[in-house]
From Swiss-Prot:
GO terms for biological process: defense response to bacterium; killing of cells of another organism. Residues 1-22 form the signal peptide. This is Pleurain-A3. It comes from Nidirana pleuraden (Yunnan pond frog). Expressed by the skin glands.
Amino acid sequence: MFTLKKTLLLLFFLGTISISLCKQARDADEDDGRKMTEEEVKRSIITMTREAKLPQLWKQIACRLYNTC
């Protein structure tokens, strides 16, 4: 009976450790997915400003070409 208790306690302990390690690894993976690097942030800002200014730029060019301003 003593060996059975000892074995069950060992299995419980090892199971708890493995679950804890899996949770830590999963949390680390989720953190990597959410955080953007500084370079990615710069790229996204440049892209957003480019997309926002491009239609306005085309309107200004068309306005000057056709003198409709």
